[in-house]
UniProtKB/Swiss-Prot annotation:
Domain of life: Eukaryota
Name of the gene: SWT21
Name the record gives this protein: Protein SWT21
Keyword Metal-binding carried by entry: no
Localization terms from the record: Nucleus
Subunit structure: Associates with snRNPs.
Main location as per UniProt: nucleus
Organism name: Kluyveromyces lactis (strain ATCC 8585 / CBS 2359 / DSM 70799 / NBRC 1267 / NRRL Y-1140 / WM37) (Yeast)
Cellular component GO terms, alphabetical: nucleus
Family, per entry: Belongs to the SWT21 family.
Alphabetical UniProt keywords: mRNA processing, mRNA splicing, Nucleus
Amino acid sequence: MQTIASTLDCYYGTNCNSLWSLEEELSRKFSAYAKNYEFPKLHRSYFHSVERYCPVICSQLTWSHDGTSICGVFDDFGIRQYLIPEDPLVDHWVPFTRWFVNGSIISSVVHPRYSLYEEDSAYQTILCSSRDLPIKLYSLRSDSINETSLYHYSTVNEENEAFETAYSMTILQDTMHFMTGSVRNRITMYDYNRHKPIWQHQWTKQSCGKSSQKAIVSCFDEYNEVHDNVRFAGTYKTEVLRIDTRSTKSELISERDSLDSWSNGIYQVIKSDNGHYLYCIKRNAREIDVIDTRMLKSRINILELPFKIGKQKFKASLNSAKGLLIGSYDGQVACWDKDCIEFGGLDPLQTAGTGIKPTNNILISDENVRVNCIATNPVDPNTLAISTSTDKFADDEGMTLKTSVKLIRMH
């Protein structure tokens, strides 16, 4: 295991103003060394003149399609882009660009053709959702100021004229449309060039039960090469929905398993490369549910986690070389190899399994840190971008919150 780049101690602590100032100082020093190129100036937060305390944890990492940069969404309302160095860095890995929105980002999605070297500016974008606001489209171009959004999309419920928060978003394969998930199991489709939705669909009480009013579409299956016109979504009621994007049709295909009495909803759905299996990662759970897309209605196996996922989520990654990867509380990454993931952990004649332990564990850090997010380089699967931190919910007043973003290469 080799560390190629790390933010080191840049985001240690919770005094945002001090951390932002340190980041700006490190960026100035780095820019001074790069004499042949003028790096963009890091933008200031809307709250730079107000004393602000919160962890600067990266909650989402997205690679560019060409593997030359990553985009990170942070808890301090910041969006940062990092360039991938040609050689390992000894000093701090500082962001290439940094800008802020003026509120908490509930969900976001980067365009699948995103790259800092992309000439078409329509691909250099990110969609962001916040409470009580429209969905906003921002530019990821290095010369963008982002004082205002490029475009916005209505989230107003016309029945009560209230904003409905988009808790999940995904861009469709044609890259011209995107979908959102919100309360009452509502799924909405938008055209990038239209302010209002194209269509909306939600489950009725009859089809979803008495608690349908509280159901939230929390995630969509993640972008890969076998989406076709069918997408899947997870909910905080531990349900899985199947969506035909050619129409307004969606259907409930999997409900909470009768043996699952402790989990608190699905927050990530990963589809195997062959498109046959869904891996549903849940809050407050000790396992990952496996669902066969050809034989729906209930889980057919589970991946046994070596720990329990609590309030703070662990974002997993499907790696074309290593299989399914998910972080842990102790600096390790649990791994189920590619053969296991492509066949749902089942032998050829099996129709259901009894649970699969990790194939192996990969040590990422000698420190006792959480590996919050893992993202695989789409060009080189042996290179990972990871977000680490100490537990932000830990009840330890004397503990310094240590967060970082790292680039590592597996052997």
